[in-house]
Amino acid sequence: MFNRIRVVTMLMMVLGVFALLQLVSGGLLFSSLQHNQQGFVISNELRQQQSELTSTWDLMLQTRINLSRSAARMMMDASNQQSSAKTDLLQNAKTTLAQAAAHYANFKNMTPLPAMAEASANVDEKYQRYQAALAELIQFLDNGNMDAYFAQPTQGMQNALGEALGNYARVSENLYRQTFDQSAHDYRFAQWQLGVLAVVLVLILMVVWFGIRHALLNPLARVITHIREIASGDLTKTLTVSGRNEIGELAGTVEHMQRSLIDTVTQVREGSDAIYSGTSEIAAGNTDLSSRTEQQASALEETAASMEQLTATVKQNADNARQASQLAQSASETARHGGKVVDGVVNTMHEIADSSKKIADIISVIDGIAFQTNILALNAAVEAARAGEQGRGFAVVAGEVRNLASRSAQAAKEIKALIEDSVSRVDTGSVLVESAGETMTDIVNAVTRVTDIMGEIASASDEQSRGIDQVALAVSEMDRVTQQNASLVQESAAAAAALEEQASRLTQAVSAFRLASRPLAVNKPEMRLSVNAQSGNTPQSLAARDDANWETF
């Protein structure tokens, strides 16, 4: 359960619980202090009220004593020889009575407690009677009325006031004792509350300690131990920490780091093995490369000789192509001229055909006129026959006109037939001339294409000539590079030896890590096969690069 709670949430809950306990304890302490304050206020008020009543009672007793002494002296000194002493006693009685009234006024100004209301009212009633009696006694003594003085029942009033004050004192004592008992009870209750809070606090601390230890300390200790094992090179153990809090996330991150480190170490081991085997293959390849470099040098010499012969042949082909291009251009000009002549003939034939068509149209008009004339002559003959002898001459003329119209129509038909035959022949000639023009156009186009092809052949021959010159330069450059390759082979052998030593050191460094049993033996041959496959494909890639270089040349 604790593993599912985040550390921040747990700390906030603990702080919330402690804050709640602090509020509860503070509230209880405030309540206890409030009760104590109320008890203290009650005790203080009782003390002040009791003090004022006591002072009032004492002063009233002194007033009674002074009055009694003054009355006694007045009775013993009938001649009034000690009038000053009597006056002083009487004045003291007035003063003490006034002081008693002042103290009682202070008592009355204090608000009585509810429990003391009845006793306070009783005291007030008895006080008012006794105070009035004392004032009346003072007045009797001032007037010298001794009979009235002794006849007044002052002692009964004094006793009644004393009993009322005693009752008030007993009620006050009971209230004070109740207040004290309540304070003692509050104190014991506060002690019990503090004890309960202490027990609850201890229980909460135990729960918090158990939760922190279970959710934070123990998983953190396992994570630290696991990290130390990883630091010592042991990658075989796994970290088992469950939960969705920060410690669980930390454990998951450490576990992911361990897996990544295992993959890295495995790849480094495989890479070091591949590098070690690759350095051996590089050393063997350097030996083969040295012999192949010598063979390449001799082949380059033969290639240089062949390139010289090829250069001479290509230059001769370029010259022949230039001459053929010039002849083709001349034939193209002649064909263009013939095409223009044929175009002129075609245009002339079209004009003749148009003229023949116009003549045929005119003959058609003449034929129509002859036909209309024949009809008119026929109508004239009919009218002449109707006229009789008067129209005989007109009939002869009409007959001649008909004969002329018939011969004109016949001649027009023959001319029309000849013209139509001429038009058909002109059309046939036009078709033949157009065919000849198209043929001349095809000849011109063919000669033009031949001219273009010969020009391209000539330019290609020039390009080949320049390319062969560049190839010759490249062959000489390749010869120089081949000489450099011989020295590079020696440097490569030294580098392969150094690489083999570094691979051995890398293998020793990686061997410090201990890995769990994994099917690595199966992966290594696959790695070797992939390396061999890549090495087998290398000549093809080199050949492809060589072809690209040849195309560049």
Curated annotation (Swiss-Prot):
GO terms (BP aspect): chemotaxis; signal transduction
Methyl-accepting transducer domain sequence ranges: 271-500
UniProt feature coiled coil, ranges: none
Topological domain spans for side Cytoplasmic: 1-6, 212-553
Region (The 3 Arg may form a positively charged pocket, which binds the alpha-carboxyl group of the attractant AA): 64-73
Modified residue annotations for Glutamate methyl ester (Gln): 295, 309
Region described as Disordered: spans on this chain: 532-553
An example Gene Ontology molecular-function term: transmembrane signaling receptor activity
Residue ranges with Polar residues bias: 532-541
Residue stretches spanning the membrane: 7-33, 191-211
Major place of residence: membrane
Entry membrane topology: Multi-pass membrane protein
All copies of domain HAMP, residue ranges: 214-266
Residues on Periplasmic side: 34-190
Keyword Kinase found: no
Comp. bias regions, Basic and acidic residues: 544-553
Source species, domain of life: Bacteria
Cellular compartments annotated: Cell inner membrane
One GO cellular component term noted in the UniProt record for this chain: plasma membrane
Keywords noted in UniProt: Cell inner membrane, Cell membrane, Chemotaxis, Membrane, Methylation, Transducer, Transmembrane, Transmembrane helix
SMART domains for this protein: HAMP (SM00304), MA (SM00283), TarH (SM00319)
Pfam families assigned: HAMP, MCPsignal, TarH
NCBIfam families hit by this protein: PRK15048.1
Similarity section: Belongs to the methyl-accepting chemotaxis (MCP) protein family.
Protein name in UniProt: Methyl-accepting chemotaxis protein II
Organism: Salmonella typhimurium (strain LT2 / SGSC1412 / ATCC 700720)
